[in-house]
Amino acid sequence: MIKEKRMKKSYTQEKMSELLGISLRQYVRIDNEEDLPRRDVLRSLIYELELSNEEIGEYIRKMTNNSNSSNIA
């Protein structure tokens, strides 16, 4: 979902990493939904991508479920 929203705004991964103040590597992990960002980065991500409350909830649920699944293995 993050990648799709970024692409709709025609932002590159490099541009997003600059806007969020994080490394490109960190942003790529967020973009690929491999990592849940820190709270401050998540706030900036919400602002930059204009995420709705519904999208935020969906993203956090998905990432939390992904995290729990990988801890089970």
Label each PLM-derived region with a short phrase:
Residues 1-19, 44, 71:
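Short basic helix-loop element that most often maps to the first helix and adjoining turn
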Residues 22-36:
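Recognition helix of helix-turn-helix/homeodomain-like DNA-binding domains
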Residues 36, 40, 53-73:
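Short, charged recognition helix plus adjacent turn
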